[in-house]
């Protein structure tokens, strides 16, 4: 970890500049972020471009009650992704051959243009549609390009960087618990505890996939620190949905690795067991003295989610077939914010499927799910645990709308996972290198010797 920090001092310095300017000269951030992208490119620091995008998205996720002046990153992040996308579009040959992820979702992005005709906020809808497509286009190709340049050292550094983001939560806690906690729940650098939990859940899957594909990438002590950190922060978040999603992945990824049929049968059995337990859940939680941790008083109404789902379903009837354009769900929830708060609900729809339905209708939702399922089913031929990732993700999407948003610190992590499990040159890296595994040891992986465009 310390070696990583020393080796990426330029990224850390730039991040400190972002924070300083964000506090004292907010408007300058709009120019500073894209200039930083070109600075990284000029110095051939391609992983730093991707790491920078991730931390900008984390900063933009900070709520106003955490650091008021950090709100500038909510708007400025658009300029960062535009700079990253601009480099990709102008130098596409550098990234050849391109990642397959975007092509799998291309039918959805082509269709998503049509619902814009029914949008009540056309400018915002167009912006969100473009940013969504750009993320699916840019992130997988940057991940693949960085791997081609640095080999497994890139993923090693990526995991360390994502771990450092979580550990920085301790710094905020040391400054003042009001910065790191909300209503008694830990949130670290993120806007809310559920957001940090989603990040941890996705991080568990990414770190597990990378560690499985290259067993020599991390030493035992490093794995202990990485996974120990993730699990600690996941538990501290108190998020029931993300805990269950992580459990689904951790329990069944070995089943799917042995046999897809065995994994599917085990998953069905798990669902039936959950149904049996849920009918006696209140008694079980009380018996073990975990009523406060699981927020038993909010269990019956799903922390307000059931009300939000019912409210969203009523509005879906107006946009049932074709939807109202991407960001339609945000427009509706914002319009009725005062009413929703009077009913005890805060936030969005808290269900990706319903949010997507509001945005692109049942037609768009079907196309999107077809692409998502197709990607992981095909990937399972390369990485068998892909099916466990798919089912765990599908469960998580039932309780949060994170995949509907593009410029958040969650979608980008899923795109990284998609890239790792779908690209043969990553998943089959040993065959690409004449079947001889790299002996990375404790000091990390050696770069894969591959041609760089």
Question: Which residues are covered by each model-predicted region?
Answer:
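Hydrophobic transmembrane alpha-helices and their immediate junctions
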Residues: 156, 160, 217, 222, ...
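Long extracytoplasmic/lumenal interhelical loops at the membrane interface
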Residues: 294-360
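Transmembrane alpha-helices of multi-pass inner-membrane enzymes
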Residues: 35-41, 205, 381-384, 388-397, ...
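Helix-loop-helix junctions and helix-breaking kinks within/between transmembrane helices
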Residues: 18-30, 70-74, 122-128, 191-197, ...
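Aromatic-anchored transmembrane helix interface
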Residues: 73-85, 100-113, 121-144
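Alpha-helical transmembrane segments of multi-pass inner-membrane proteins
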Residues: 110-114, 134-138, 152-181, 191-256, ...
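N-terminal signal-anchor transmembrane segment
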Residues: 2-88, 114, 118, 393-395
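A membrane-periplasm/extracellular boundary helix in multi-pass inner-membrane enzymes
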Residues: 171-176, 232, 254-296, 313-318, ...
